Amino acid sequence: MNLLSGWVRPLMLGCGLLGAALSAGSIQAAVCEYRVTNEWGSGFTASIRITNNGSSTINGWSVSWNYTDGSRVTSSWNAGLSGANPYSATPVGWNTSIPIGSSVEFGVQGNNGSSRAQVPAVTGAICGGQGSSAPSSVASSSSSSSVVSSTPRSSSSSVSSSVPGTSSSSSSSVLTGAQACNWYGTLTPLCNNTSNGWGYEDGRSCVARTTCSAQPAPYGIVSTSSSTPLSSSSSSRSSVASSSSLSSATSSSASSVSSVPPIDGGCNGYATRYWDCCKPHCGWSANVPSLVSPLQSCSANNTRLSDVSVGSSCDGGGGYMCWDKIPFAVSPTLAYGYAATSSGDVCGRCYQLQFTGSSYNAPGDPGSAALAGKTMIVQATNIGYDVSGGQFDILVPGGGVGAFNACSAQWGVSNAELGAQYGGFLAACKQQLGYNASLSQYKSCVLNRCDSVFGSRGLTQLQQGCTWFAEWFEAADNPSLKYKEVPCPAELTTRSGMNRSILNDIRNTCP
């Protein structure tokens, strides 16, 4: 299958807003973008993003579109879809309201018609916002285009959902008092029954109120009529203090950065995933430069150890990977994390990863397509004999133990619960569901395993990292990427304790 990875075509759309939900006289200024995120010989994926640049909250939205070349949608996620060309999309409950400055996004996958990934006109009520029509920073194999819909028309205000678990009754049960969680810039449902960490209720992932409230400003619990956090009390924060070791300085720094410049050129690589619970290579003083502190290890109960010479749990010692090395979202398009790389002087180096929209070894992977245009910055904490050049083995709880396994003993789980040795939960889900299932099915399966292994045992931080993989990382299976070495953000060095900036030795060449 010949993949055209990373091809993105933006289109400014007319955005249909449900008139009954709008207050009289309010002026909406939403920017709506249709993007072809990936295309291969017979199919495509695309996303539609609605950004509220207006002066009031958008309460309810609807968009419609029609393919004229025979293209057809085969699956969707994060929206209720109806019709068989034309198509209409409406919210799934938790993304009904769009606070000022926030956005919602949903995606579709389909089969191509007689042309390459047609960009249809999307109709609805007028979107009044102005947005950039510049191409995405993803390397493009085709020219980008931008079209403003000049003749929008009203779309149906009542669209039934064709996505399991997205009916109005089930959606409303995940929402708590017309509130949602602004999880580092992404609106996420609040849980009704889960008291701490992340949960999975009524067919979707949700965040407990205490966990949501523990985020730094401006994030937290928001009203559907306001983007201002409603709860950040010290009592709420203290109840989940154990689930986050991020310092206040780190939190404030993380909230001030939402994007990084795109990579110009760069090196070719790909990302895999693992979490083996072992003490990492960079945890020994002999493996880091003399002016750099080694990575601290933790005990079996996740308490930091001051003795850097403690042996690895994978060799019978008491040193484990600390749970604060989970990946985390900074914005909807930027995340930070930690990774194993190939051998050499890598400890403490940071790399910008820009995902191209295709998989390294799984052609047509819907998760890799949905990940297109997103960026990660990872710090190297480990090396692996099974990690090749250009490969970044990202630390993801539930990502597979790989060559070593100290997790079964540390977490009290069976080997079978850990999923596939290489690939973890997602690989096990693909074995269970087959390799032609929809992205929403893969995500749901992974989230169920996150809840079963971590949520049921109160392993909140690990559950957050696992959920991040399904949500922000789009359950992408070994996505291809462009990368380059960059200065390390304070958010990463504060957590790891490794800061090699004094060495001023960033490499600008590909291996």
UniProtKB/Swiss-Prot annotation:
Family (UniProt): Belongs to the glycosyl hydrolase 45 (cellulase K) family.
Disulphides: 32-127, 181-212, 191-206
Superkingdom of the source species: Bacteria
Domain CBM2: 30-130
UniProt GO MF annotations: cellulase activity; cellulose binding
Example GO biological process: cellulose catabolic process
Keyword terms, alphabetized: Carbohydrate metabolism, Cellulose degradation, Disulfide bond, Glycosidase, Hydrolase, Periplasm, Polysaccharide degradation, Signal
Active-site positions on this chain: 276, 393
Chief localization: periplasm
Name listed for the protein in its UniProt record: Endoglucanase B
